[in-house]
């Protein structure tokens, strides 16, 4: 069992626990990865095993505002990145590096990095049917973005922060080789912060199959998008309204659940 938490010093700590009789064995806790955080915000937070069996870890840019240290575009730091590691290596190391990670062997680059140019990708998930990777990345003040990386990607994508916020200029600089979001929306009219979700693969709402369900923390509505074959996006606002959505979950049958800051857990059963 793996967990990602912010410790009492404000740093990111990914830990491993033995699992027995349906419970984590707290005495077995082992640090897998510890990352110093310079500020108290933008810690990221999501972790998930990919279809390839490796552990993916989302880390924000380190916080403050505007990425003052340029972490998003720097390959020398883990901040502002999506990482990909082997949490159970041989030889006594805390974790291993998959040999096909995109920056293995590159001078000055951290080999753990799978993707970069992210501001605060605190929620991401894999499509259980296709293996596609979906990332909800919180913007600075103007734009919220959703990124999608197709299954089978070789990694190394640059999603633009802080040169770009979404697909729009932010700090300036060359945008060559950057990957734009598949969907973005402007902040305003009650929106403030995207909460990434899951591609719906359940049976309760057949017409939602293949749609990526997400939310905005401030707006409260559940939203859904679906990519067309030509790369354009269909969008719909779902009926469900839940305030302060902080996370989503998906059960073994593909049904989607939303969690709110108030402590509620809600299953999506209709549009």
Map each language-model feature to its residues:
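Short turn/helix-capping motifs enriched in Asx and small/polar residues
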Residues: 68-75
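Short, small-residue-rich loop/turn micro-motifs
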Residues: 59-61, 86, 165
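Acidic/polar, glycine-anchored loop/turn motif associated with catalytic or activation segments
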Residues: 146
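Blade-edge beta-strand/turn elements of extracellular beta-propeller
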Residues: 17-38, 75-120, 130, 172-189, ...
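Acidic, Gly/Ser/Thr-rich repeat motifs that build Ca2+-stabilized beta-propeller blades
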Residues: 1-66, 123-126, 131-139, 143, ...
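Mobile, glycine-enriched helix-loop/loop "lid" segments at the mouths of ligand-binding/catalytic clefts
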Residues: 89, 150-177
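Repeated scaffold domains used in trafficking and secretory/extracellular systems
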Residues: 244-247
């Amino acid at each position: 069992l793996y967990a990602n938490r912010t410790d009492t010093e404000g740093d990111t700590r990914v830990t491993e626990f033995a699992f027995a009789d349906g419970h984590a064995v707290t005495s077995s806790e082992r640090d897998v990865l510890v990352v110093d955080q310079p500020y108290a915000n933008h810690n990221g937070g999501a972790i998930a095993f990919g279809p390839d069996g490796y552990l993916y870890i989302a880390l924000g840019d380190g916080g403050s505002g505007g990425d003052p240290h340029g972490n998003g575009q720097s390959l020398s730091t883990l901040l502002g990145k999506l990482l990909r590691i082997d949490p159970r290596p041989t030889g006594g190391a805390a974790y291993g590096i998959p040999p096909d990670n995109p920056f293995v062997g590159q001078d000055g680059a951290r080999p753990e990095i799978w993707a970069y140019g992210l501001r605060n990708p605190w929620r991401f998930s894999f499509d259980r049917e296709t293996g596609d990777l979906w990332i909800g990345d919180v913007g600075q003040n103007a734009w919220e973005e959703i990124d999608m990386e197709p299954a089978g990607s070789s990694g190394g994508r640059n999603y633009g922060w802080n040169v770009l916020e979404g697909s729009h200029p932010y700090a300036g600089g060359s945008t060559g080789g950057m990957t734009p979001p598949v969907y973005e929306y402007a902040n305003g009219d009650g929106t403030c912060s995207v909460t990434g979700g899951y591609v719906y693969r359940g049976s309760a709402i057949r017409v939602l199959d293949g749609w990526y369900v997400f939310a905005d923390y401030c707006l409260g509505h559940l939203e859904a998008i679906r990519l067309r074959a030509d790369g354009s996006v269909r969008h719909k606002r779902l009926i469900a309204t839940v305030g302060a959505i902080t996370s989503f979950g998906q059960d073994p049958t593909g049904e989607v659940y939303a969690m709110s800051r108030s402590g509620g857990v809600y299953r999506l059963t209709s549009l």
